[in-house]
Amino acid sequence: MLKLFAKYTSIGVLNTLIHWVVFGVCIYVAHTNQALANFAGFVVAVSFSFFANAKFTFKASTTTMRYMLYVGFMGTLSATVGWAADRCALPPMITLVTFSAISLVCGFVYSKFIVFRDAK
């Protein structure tokens, strides 16, 4: 399980970079609120994360249902963190770090036990 989590984390680093860049562009260039910026970062990064983890971490086939399960869960998580950040007036960097930590742990558990549960 630790080896699997290490692979998931490696892909997560790239995913996080993608997410953070999009988030920053939305906040500092497009001047959106944090909920929208966090969700936009998620949308761009989630497909990479899904396909990379399916192939390299879980060695599983990609199906529409698996993709929808993953995107639905992670999207809800992203929107919730962004909404809470706006309600609490958190600085954008705190929002990014918070979402990155929560999504790493929750995303791994959800992927392993729900999305890719019947994979190898």
Curated annotation (Swiss-Prot):
Kindly indicate where the leader peptide sits in this chain: none
Task: Give the GO cellular component terms, alphabetically.
Answer: plasma membrane
Give the record's keywords alphabetically: Cell inner membrane, Cell membrane, Membrane, Transmembrane, Transmembrane helix, Transport
Q: Which compartments does it reside in? A: Cell inner membrane
Q: Membrane-crossing residues?
A: 10-30, 34-54, 65-85, 89-109
User: How does the protein's chain sit in the membrane according to the entry?
Assistant: Multi-pass membrane protein
Question: One biological-process term from Gene Ontology?
Answer: polysaccharide biosynthetic process
UniProt cross-references to InterPro entries, sorted A to Z: Glc_translocase_bactprenl-link, GtrA_CellWall_Glycosyl, GtrA_DPMS_TM
Q: Name one GO molecular function term.
A: glutamyl-tRNA reductase activity
The chain's Periplasmic topological domains, given as residue ranges, are: 31-33, 86-88
Where mainly found? membrane
Q: Which residues lie on this side of the membrane: Cytoplasmic?
A: 1-9, 55-64, 110-120
KW Ribonucleoprotein (keyword) present: no
Which PANTHER family would you find in this protein's record? Answer: PROPHAGE BACTOPRENOL-LINKED GLUCOSE TRANSLOCASE HOMOLOG
State the function annotated in the UniProt record. Answer: Involved in O antigen modification. Involved in the translocation of bactoprenol-linked glucose across the cytoplasmic membrane.
What is stated as this protein's family in its record?
Answer: Belongs to the GtrA family.
Instruction: Tell me what this protein is called.
Output: Prophage bactoprenol-linked glucose translocase homolog
From which source organism is this entry? Escherichia coli (strain K12)
Q: What is the lineage of its organism?
A: Bacteria, Pseudomonadati, Pseudomonadota, Gammaproteobacteria, Enterobacterales
